[in-house]
């Protein structure tokens, strides 16, 4: 079967941001079902430090995470001055060492643990990328094996993970979180924190002083460390997509993982741009700390003992934090972060149950005030943050959110949980209100506002609209892609054509398709409300098939995510591709299967004429552009009208052109081109006349002439006017 294609003309704008942000406020809770680690954005509800740290006066947390350890001596030498400076603050030395291998009985490790350090997981052998060689089992084994090894250290329980090379390549993947992090090791162990996503502070955050986000040379202070343009000796980061922007807060990935986003730059990113131990790196780290304190977030610093940063620079950063902010800044190791989240935020609960499964905790903004709240089924507790008072308010939680879908079913923007068997729980006026409802015909689905009316629909095999008056779901006639269940893990919802409505990318082990949401009705084109515009669809074996989003089987998540107007894939089969990822831009997706431009020679060959006739090529780009009419003059000049301004003008102004061409060597090909007249309003006709030319450019018929001999018109007269403009194609 060959893929089915529909032609589509579209203009794609520049990248509109890091991640896809749904237009409808009713979709503010879809992150709970999003497997991507890159969904937070600048305006996403935040979990500020006072909400979870459990210590009065502390406004920001700093973690110091040093990577790559496989022997103790080198790390002791590098860290010792840093540890001693930390001890001067409160007697502790809270540093986390992201470790590959270490002897569990190494005596140095016990010294560190007593001082306040923790030993965390960095895989057994540091593969870059982790997913490679077409061997998922290799990746899982080096992660879980590292966790089991470090658990043999007396007094050490590893809780955190950092992905090797996460600061220099696309080694991080949704496949890792869904199929490795969220599982348990052979020893039944699991982790609680990842710290591999990088947060870029940008000048788009208008709450920050300009000097914090722009350096003395006028460059973006933090974006510059991810260079986009190739330069000798510099690794370009043009396709590096392991980032979020302006969100220095912990967040939850795929329900079971706390993400502590890393600060840009790491010491590797700094040396890549400005060399080893450059003073500018320390200056920018200090500004990152300033930002963290102002935003009441976390600064998670990535560094190594490889000479990219010096010990003294780390000591100076600690010294700056202590002297500038005092007790407002708290240094913690990752075990302390996990403990404080569970004690002070979750009241003794956890994202994961004793066996590593989903404990039902949901971190979400219940009242749409911009701050995260929590529901904790093990404690039957709802906790809502009172930002003005700076404290939590609590109320009972009368249901278990596991198996339920969250969304907005009320114009008040209140959060609801929907039980597809016949109950809706809505949080309003600080309590949960229970509503018995008539279930939809589809019992499996998710809540998502697809028509942007501010109320979520129930998406299953069909689209079901909420009827609040009768407390029921009504099946709509909106078009759904054939044989596609809208809760399928092989679907990604994203606005491909920037019309404000979510479109569908679908790809599983047998089928794939690209479907645009359509509001218009056009029976001839097959357009009906819903996902009726089929850009392309086909079978897995089709040439050019969209890579799988879900591959089925035991480990289905295939590592797809949306970022910067692209869909990306990172898995064990992409490691040999450029930047270790597969990718499709939105422009490519919308042009899927469309005809590609032909060379002038190939275009000539494509013509078919009757016997006795032939087609000769006399002019092509770049001598002409967007030609719509031509005529010869008695002097042999070829006059051409160009409508490059169709259909909306150029920057809103007329941009049509008339030019003349000459065949200087008499070979039949017009190689010299001169612009005669510009700024015409959609010209569609030209005729040599007298000493000049006649041009039809509605509403006018114009006579233009060159009287100076420079080849350009200096006389322009309107001979007739008043012609109806209408559609340029219908003149």
Predicted regions and their residues:
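Active-site-adjacent pocket scaffolds in enzyme catalytic domains
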Residues: 19-41, 48-50, 156-159, 163-294
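Active-site beta->alpha N-cap acidic-glycine motif
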Residues: 25-118, 125-128, 136, 142-151, ...
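C-terminal domain-boundary segment and adjacent tail
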Residues: 36-39, 44-47, 54, 88-90, ...
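Repeat-based blade/solenoid architectures
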Residues: 352-361, 400-413, 435-446, 480-492, ...
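Beta-propeller blade termini
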Residues: 359-366, 405-418, 443-450, 489-496, ...
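Acidic/hydrophobic-patterned starts of short beta strands in beta-sheet-rich repeat architectures
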Residues: 368-377, 414-420, 450-460, 498-507, ...
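Beta-propeller blade repeat segments, especially FG-GAP/WD-type strand-to-loop junctions
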Residues: 380-400, 421-437, 462-478, 511-535, ...
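Beta-propeller domains with acidic blade repeats across secreted/periplasmic ectodomains
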Residues: 579-731
């Amino acid at each position: 079967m060959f893929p089915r294609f529909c032609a589509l003309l579209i203009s794609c704008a520049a990248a509109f941001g890091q991640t896809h942000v749904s237009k409808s406020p009713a979709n503010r809770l879809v992150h709970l079902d999003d497997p991507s680690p890159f969904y937070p954005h600048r305006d996403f509800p935040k979990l500020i430090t006072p909400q979870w740290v459990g210590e009065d006066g502390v406004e920001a947390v700093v973690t110091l995470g040093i990577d790559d350890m496989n022997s103790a001596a080198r790390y002791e030498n590098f860290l010792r001055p840093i540890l001693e400076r930390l001890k001067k603050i409160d007697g502790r030395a809270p540093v986390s060492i992201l470790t590959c291998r270490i002897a569990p009985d190494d005596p140095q490790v016990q010294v560190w643990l007593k001082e306040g350090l923790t030993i965390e997981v960095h895989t057994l052998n540091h593969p870059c990328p982790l997913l490679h060689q077409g061997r998922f089992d290799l990746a899982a084994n080096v992660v879980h094996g590292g966790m089991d090894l470090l658990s043999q250290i007396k007094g050490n329980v590893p809780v955190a993970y950092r992905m090797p090379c996460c600061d220099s390549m696309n080694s991080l993947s949704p496949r890792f979180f869904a199929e490795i992090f969220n599982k348990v090791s052979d020893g039944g162990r699991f982790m609680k924190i990842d710290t591999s996503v990088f947060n870029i502070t940008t000048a788009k955050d208008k709450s920050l002083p300009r000097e914090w986000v722009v350096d003395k040379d006028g460059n973006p202070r933090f974006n510059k460390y991810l260079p986009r343009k190739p330069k000798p000796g510099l690794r370009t980061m043009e396709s590096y997509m392991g980032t979020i922007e302006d969100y220095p807060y912990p967040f939850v990935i795929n329900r079971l993982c706390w993400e502590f986003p890393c600060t840009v730059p790491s010491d590797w990113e700094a040396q890549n741009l400005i060399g080893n131990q450059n003073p500018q790196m320390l200056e920018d780290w200090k500004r990152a700390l300033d930002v963290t304190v102002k935003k009441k977030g976390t600064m998670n610093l990535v560094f190594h003992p490889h000479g990219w940063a010096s010990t003294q620079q780390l000591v100076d950063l600690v010294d700056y934090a202590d002297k500038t902010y005092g007790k407002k800044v708290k240094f913690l190791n990752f075990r302390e972060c996990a403990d404080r989240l569970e004690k002070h935020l979750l009241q003794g609960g956890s994202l994961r149950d004793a066996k590593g499964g989903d404990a039902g905790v949901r971190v979400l903004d219940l009242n749409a005030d911009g701050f995260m709240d929590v529901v904790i089924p093990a404690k039957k507790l709802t906790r809502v943050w009172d930002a003005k008072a700076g404290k939590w308010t609590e109320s009972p939680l009368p249901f278990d959110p596991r198996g339920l879908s969250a969304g907005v079913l009320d114009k008040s923007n209140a959060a609801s949980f929907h039980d597809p068997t016949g109950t809706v729980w809505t949080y309003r006026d600080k309590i949960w209100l229970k509503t018995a409802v008539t279930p939809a015909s589809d019992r499996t689905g998710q809540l998502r506002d697809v028509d942007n009316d501010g109320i979520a629909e129930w998406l299953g095999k069909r689209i079901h609209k909420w009827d609040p008056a009768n407390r029921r779901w009504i099946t709509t006639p909106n078009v759904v892609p054939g044989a596609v269940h809208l809760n399928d893990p092989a679907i990604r919802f994203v606005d491909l054509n920037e019309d404000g409505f979510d479109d569908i990318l679908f790809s599983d082990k047998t089928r794939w398709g690209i479907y645009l949401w359509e509001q218009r009705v056009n029976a001839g084109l097959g357009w009906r409300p819903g996902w009726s515009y089929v850009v392309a669809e086909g079978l897995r074996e089709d040439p050019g098939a969209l890579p799988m989003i879900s591959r089925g089987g035991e480990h289905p998540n295939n590592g797809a995510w949306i970022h910067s107007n692209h869909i990306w894939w990172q898995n064990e089969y992409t490691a040999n591709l450029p930047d270790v990822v597969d990718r499709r831009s939105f422009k490519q997706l919308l042009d899927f299967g469309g005809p590609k431009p032909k060379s002038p020679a190939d275009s000539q060959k494509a013509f078919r004429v009757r016997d006795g006739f032939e087609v000769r090529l006399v002019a092509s780009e770049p001598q002409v552009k967007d030609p719509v009419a031509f005529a010869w003059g008695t002097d042999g000049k070829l006059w051409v009208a160009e409508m490059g301004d169709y259909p909306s003008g150029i920057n809103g102004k007329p941009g049509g052109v008339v030019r003349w061409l000459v065949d200087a060597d008499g070979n039949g090909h017009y190689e010299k081109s001169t612009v005669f007249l510009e700024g015409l309003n959609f010209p569609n006709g030209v005729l040599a006349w007298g000493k000049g030319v006649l041009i039809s450019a509605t509403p006018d018929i114009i006579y233009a002439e060159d009287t100076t001999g420079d080849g350009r018109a200096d006389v322009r007269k309107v001979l007739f006017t008043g012609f109806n403009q209408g559609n340029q194609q219908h003149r």
